Amino acid sequence: MSLNFFLRRYTVFPWSRKLGQYYHDAKRESSAWTESFHPFDEDLSKAALTFCITALLASLAYFLRQKEIVRLGCDLMNIFYVFDECADIADKEGASQIRDVVMDDLHRPEKTCPGGEILPGEMVKYVLLLCPEIPETYYNTKSFGFAPQSSSPQPHIVCATLSRISMPTQQQWFNVKRTIGPNVFLARSATVLPYAETHTFYHPRMIALREQAPFLDINSYPMKVRGLVQGSINWLEGYAAGVQAAFLDNIANLPSCAKEVESRVNIYVNELAQWARGNDDWTFESGRYFGDRGPENQSDIPTSSNR
């Protein structure tokens, strides 16, 4: 069944599409690494992983970073995919248990799990033990995105699982969106602007940028709620336009800082914006939301998506 709607292009954003030079190598290596765990019993799941091109998002978001960072981003995207596969077939309690094990592995990767390791946890341990230089701030309980948020008693993956079987309101969807996907990419950007620089990192405009970046994406919403009418999409576009205007205003009015900090601030802010730009391009290019018609639909024309 096909759902037709109209989306405006994401062309007024000052940041353009940029794909890192390490994309193909990082994608190949990360795919081989993921497949070495034999995570999928069915060819369909493996095909879906390839179809969604999870490595593409990491390469679009970190196009200026060294190969190791791009590869790490690809690995994490694949871990998220495997995590979702496990949670999709679990009930609420089971998804919570998976989350708890993975959280424990994040903070104590050297610990042996007495009850046996689950696959997402095993993959997380491998990454953290292989890359001990990853700052703790990168995978703290909030930034990594696996932990419950203070505003919601449920782990994000449980909320996301429940949203598949119920029709969330716009506010409910916004609450879930604050806790998922983007946080890991925004957290990776934080490594160039250490948390120790509290005055800069926690300035109100910098906080606002981090909160606004995930909401620059509206393209995934029609697929998630399975049935938005065009009027609602128009409302979302207006909402996103307001977020974008506020995002750009915050960048233009960031406070002055010491010269030695300014370069890191610029990198940090540009990575926040480039993630938003890359996520929009990935939405159309990956096949996740629009199948093989993504490039065709990335224009000011009526858009079709399989329901």
UniProtKB/Swiss-Prot annotation:
Residues 287-307 are annotated as: Disordered. GO terms for molecular function: metal ion binding. Residues 296-307 have a biased composition (Polar residues). InterPro entries: Isoprenoid_synthase_dom_sf. The keyword Iron does not apply. The keyword Magnesium applies. It comes from the Eukaryota. Keywords: Magnesium, Metal-binding. Belongs to the terpene synthase family. This is Sesquiterpene synthase-like protein Agr10. It comes from Cyclocybe aegerita. The gene is Agr10.
